[in-house]
Regions:
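Topological signature of polytopic alpha-helical transporters
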Residues: 3-7, 21, 95-169
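Short loop immediately C-terminal to the Walker-B catalytic DE motif
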Residues: 55-56
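Helical segment within the ABC ATPase nucleotide-binding domain
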Residues: 63-76
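Hydrophobic anchor residue at the start of the ABC signature
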Residues: 38-39
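Conserved ABC nucleotide-binding domain
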Residues: 2-5, 11-26
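A short, proline-enriched helix->beta-strand linker immediately N-terminal to the Walker B motif
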Residues: 43-47
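Catalytic Walker B motif of ABC-type/P-loop ATPase nucleotide-binding domains
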Residues: 49-52
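ABC transporter NBD signature
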Residues: 29
């Protein structure tokens, strides 16, 4: 029992919900419910955590805190795969991917190289570029010439060939 209580306390602390342990879920805000959901996942000590918009609806300070938690998890033998449209804390990510309309991979790599790669001043401008089919094709082809893609190609040639085949359809 003590081990379970300690694990629960650690998960609650990780998502900054101390003092809410006895609160009914129906009485929590949307952001708090989201954090409870993540805390429940943390109890399983996952090796892979897949999150869909985990920071939407959170205040800026909690958004940053949640992204820092994901970064800590990624450095503790847990791969964190996250879908987000919030660009304010992407500098906390080790790698990011940008997909064009239709799921076409246009970029995968370090967040600090994004703006140069897409030739934009503001990261949010990338979304507009990746709505245009011609721009998507341009960046898909550009990505295939990057050192990052070549490293992935060498490590997983079958996966890269399958991705290319799907994008060409």
């Amino acid at each position: 029992r003590a081990e379970i209580a300690a694990a629960v306390a650690h998960a609650i602390e990780a998502v900054d919900l101390q003092g809410r342990e006895k609160t009914f879920i129906s009485r929590l805000s949307g952001g708090q419910k989201k954090r409870v959901s993540i805390a429940m996942e943390l109890l399983a000590n996952p090796r892979l955590l897949i999150l869909d918009e985990p920071t939407s609806g959170l205040s800026p300070d909690l958004d940053r805190s949640m992204m820092e938690l994901c970064r800590r998890l990624s450095h503790q033998n847990c791969t964190v795969l996250m879908v987000t449209h919030n660009m304010s804390n992407i500098n906390l990510c080790d790698k990011i991917a940008f997909l064009g309309v239709g799921g076409v991979l246009c970029y995968y790599g370090a967040p600090e190289k994004l703006n140069d790669y897409f030739d934009v001043e503001m990261t949010s401008d990338i979304f507009e570029k990746l709505r245009d089919p011609e721009q998507i094709e341009l960046y898909r082809e550009k990505y295939y010439t990057t050192p990052e893609f070549n490293r992935l190609l060498a490590a997983c040639p079958e996966a890269a060939q399958e991705a290319d085949k799907r994008c060409s359809q």
